[in-house]
């Protein structure tokens, strides 16, 4: 008799077939949200390849996605931790601590010897992506690191940087900041491995000490060499600090085991438990019921539980497509547009994309380029200016930058202005729509809502520390389903129904997506639901705007996320459901709006008559740079001790800094990043005195309103003071 152990996880399906105590078949594959289909495929294979027979052999299931599948096959469901513990007990009787990291969950098990055997203490994290495989993979995709390279990237010997370990979304933001400051991707990945181990040891040990021997299970622990190195470093350090007695003659590193079968321990545990069950329990009943569920059952259930689709019918899609085409047609520059003199260039170095536009002296758009960030701001700048030059624009009369990378690149490129993002986006919107009431800019990792009064920004809402409602989250989900971003809308519009996703935090939204795919919702249906929930997160969760009617009638949608047709359809429907007579308009250059706003600001510089500081195309193309982040770059001007990065760029005429702790030769200029205040931009006392003088000047020129309000709140009125004085 054969026993099948199958683990249906959040990202993969794994299975083993055991006969007479030996594994005769095993495999694991990603299911891309089609859990039932992948399980059916595995069952078909074990029947043909391993000789499994329905009605004779037995099957046991575990994993987050096995709950509804197991009964359809006649299988019994076993809790994941119980299954893992059973296999560890049999295969590694000396192990006292287990860490299993999965795609979207992680668990730790402490084994303690007792008089009658072993006691087990279990801690799990399943509602947050922090410290899981997805935590690492999402950030690696953002950095455009292939899986094969990621698996071999090291931890040892590299400088580490602060990366949030509590949340995968915050970790992406931290990684993005490090990229924009020029930190090598190798150091960022090593820092991610550090964060994963820290999250496990800080959160899932609950103060207990992982005693040797230690067993590391799950795909991330098996495939990522750097993660194994991080585990060994921290565990050996912990044992030394807590004076844990280690077995004599054993290398401490050998006490941390990563077995070759680390993926299959839950499956093997199912088999171990199944051997002790009565013979009539969990007999495999074949694939017929599962096939019925795939073909009919799941659709019946989804029809009852789901909401309407993004598109209510062919006429709805046709009408919206006509409006979409009208908006997009306005974005086509006239073919005969030519530069007749110096041009204005605006660049927006965002979190996920880099954009550049060229305007004529009369503010006509002549050229634009838009590309996903390569992960390095200087390389992004070189690529953009290469395209500008190839388009024939050599005479630059003004250059302005905006976005996350503006501070780093302003001096390097010789930009005339660095424009705050809200100013750039408001300028771009008002240039095309002077009667706008609200501007909604949804970018890669932030959301900006600007409320206008008489052509000026009266209020704004900014959401930059959460994934709720931003484009990077949509891109991450599309990547997970192996759907090119350009096909997102087409696939989402194919859905005939969609689940109701929870509003709010991106981490919980991710968990909700996993829950919906367990119920059988397809990738297309989940992508449609994600587009539908985005406006709710943008306006209500991020913007805290419950009454859209109160902020105006004309809404301008811009930002790269609004290049997604499905997102715009959801936005239009949501806004008009709240403001029936709303005029919702897509900015003709939604992705390039920030760059256009910067270029328009450069026009004001041009009017002043001063020559541009632009360093020239040849200088930018030939840029050579190095980045340094180590003990000598840590800021010492206050107790926070920011970990700064020194980005040294080779530029003609630069003075260098021979006196620095990190010496800089003549012909090189230093850009400092990673600081949290202006003091972090300087290295010596003389520079600090100049910074302090400027800060004091600002204090004198602009009163501290908060301090004035505080003093006034606690000051008795003159009348009250007089009464008290008379009484005395």
Describe each PLM feature range.
Residues 133-138, 245, 256-299, 427, ...:
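Glycine-rich phosphate-binding/hydrolytic loop that grips phosphoryl groups
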Residues 269, 273-342, 448, 601-692:
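Acidic, glycine/GT-rich loop-and beta-edge segments that sit at the periphery of enzyme/chaperone cores
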Residues 64-65, 206-239, 243, 259-266, ...:
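Glycine-rich phosphate-binding loops at beta-strand->alpha-helix junctions
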Residues 191-212, 322-334, 529-551:
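Phosphate/ATP-binding catalytic cores across multiple sugar-kinase/actin-like superfamilies
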Residues 77-81, 232-268, 416-423, 574-596:
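Conserved phosphate-binding/catalytic loops in two-lobed NTP-binding clefts
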Residues 34, 113, 118-159, 263-266, ...:
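Glycine-rich phosphate-binding loop plus the immediately following alpha-helix
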Residues 3-45, 118-122, 126, 347-387, ...:
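Short glycine-rich, Thr/Ser-proximal phosphate-binding strand/loop in the N-terminal lobe
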Residues 173-202, 511-541:
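Adenine-nucleotide phosphate-binding core of ATP-dependent small-molecule kinases
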């Amino acid at each position: 008799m054969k026993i099948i152990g199958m683990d249906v996880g959040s990202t993969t399906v794994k299975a083993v077939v055991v006969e007479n105590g030996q594994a005769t078949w095993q495999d694991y594959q990603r299911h891309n949200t089609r859990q039932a289909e992948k399980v059916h495929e595995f069952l078909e294979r074990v029947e043909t390849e391993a000789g499994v027979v329905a009605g004779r052999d037995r099957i046991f299931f575990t994993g987050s996605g096995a709950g509804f599948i197991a009964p359809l096959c006649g299988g019994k469901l076993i809790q994941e931790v119980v299954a893992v513990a059973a296999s560890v007990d049999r295969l590694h009787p000396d192990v006292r601590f287990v860490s299993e990291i999965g795609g979207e969950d992680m668990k730790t098990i402490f084994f303690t010897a007792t008089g009658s055997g072993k006691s087990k203490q279990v801690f799990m994290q399943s509602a947050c992506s922090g410290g899981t495989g997805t935590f690492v993979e999402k950030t690696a995709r953002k950095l455009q690191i292939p899986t094969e390279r990621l698996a071999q990237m090291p931890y040892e010997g590299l400088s580490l940087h602060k990366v949030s370990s509590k949340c995968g979304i915050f970790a992406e933001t931290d990684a993005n900041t490090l990229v924009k400051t020029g930190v090598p991707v190798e150091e960022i990945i090593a820092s991610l491995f550090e964060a994963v181990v820290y999250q496990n040891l800080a959160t899932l040990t609950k103060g207990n000490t992982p005693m040797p021997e230690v067993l590391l299970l799950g795909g991330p622990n098996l495939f990522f060499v750097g993660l194994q190195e991080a585990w060994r470093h921290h565990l050996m350090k912990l044992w030394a600090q807590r004076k844990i007695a280690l077995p004599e003659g054993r290398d401490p590193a050998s006490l941390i085991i990563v077995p070759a079968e680390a993926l299959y321990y839950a499956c093997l545990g199912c088999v171990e438990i199944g051997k002790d069950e009565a013979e009539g329990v969990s007999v495999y009943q074949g694939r017929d019921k599962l096939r019925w569920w795939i073909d009919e059952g799941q659709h019946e259930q989804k029809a009852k539980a789901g909401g309407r689709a993004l598109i209510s019918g062919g006429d709805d899609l046709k009408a919206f497509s006509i409006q979409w085409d009208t908006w997009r047609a306005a974005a086509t520059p006239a073919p005969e547009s030519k530069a007749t003199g110096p041009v204005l260039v605006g660049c927006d170095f965002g979190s996920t994309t880099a954009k550049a536009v060229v305007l004529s002296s009369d503010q006509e758009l002549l050229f634009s380029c838009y590309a996903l960030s390569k992960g390095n701001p200087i390389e992004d700048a070189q690529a953009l200016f290469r395209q500008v030059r190839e388009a024939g624009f050599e005479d630059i009369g003004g250059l302005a930058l905006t976005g996350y990378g503006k501070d780093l690149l302003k001096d390097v490129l010789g930009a005339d202005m660095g424009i705050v993002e809200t100013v750039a986006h408001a300028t771009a919107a008002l240039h095309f729509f002077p009667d706008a009431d609200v501007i909604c800019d949804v970018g890669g990792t932030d959301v900006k809502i600007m409320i206008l009064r008489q052509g000026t920004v009266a209020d704004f809402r900014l959401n930059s520390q959460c994934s709720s409602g931003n484009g990077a989250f949509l891109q991450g989900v599309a990547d997970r389903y192996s759907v090119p971003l350009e096909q997102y809308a087409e696939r989402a519009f194919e859905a005939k129904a969609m689940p109701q996703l929870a509003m709010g935090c991106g981490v919980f939204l991710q968990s909700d997506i996993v829950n919906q795919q367990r119920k059988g919702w397809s990738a297309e249906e989940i992508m449609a639901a994600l587009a539908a929930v985005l406006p709710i997160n943008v306006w209500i969760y991020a913007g805290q705007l419950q009454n859209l009617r109160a902020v105006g009638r004309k809404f301008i949608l811009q930002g790269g996320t609004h290049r997604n047709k499905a997102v715009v359809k959801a936005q239009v429907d949501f806004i008009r459901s709240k403001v029936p007579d709303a005029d919702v308009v897509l900015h003709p250059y939604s992705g390039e709006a920030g760059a256009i706003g910067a270029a328009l600001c450069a026009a004001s510089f041009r009017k002043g008559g001063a020559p541009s500081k632009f360093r020239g195309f040849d200088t930018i193309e030939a840029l050579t740079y190095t980045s340094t982040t180590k003990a000598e770059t840590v800021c010492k001007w206050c107790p926070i001790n920011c970990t700064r990065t020194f980005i040294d760029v080779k530029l003609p005429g630069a003075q260098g800094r021979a006196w620095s702790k990190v010496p800089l030769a003549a012909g090189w200029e230093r850009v400092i990043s990673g600081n949290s205040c202006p003091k972090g931009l300087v290295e010596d006392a003389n520079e600090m005195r100049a910074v302090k003088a400027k800060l004091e000047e600002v204090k004198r020129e602009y009163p501290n309103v908060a301090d004035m309000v505080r003093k006034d709140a606690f000051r008795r009125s003159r009348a009250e003071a007089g009464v008290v004085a008379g009484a005395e």
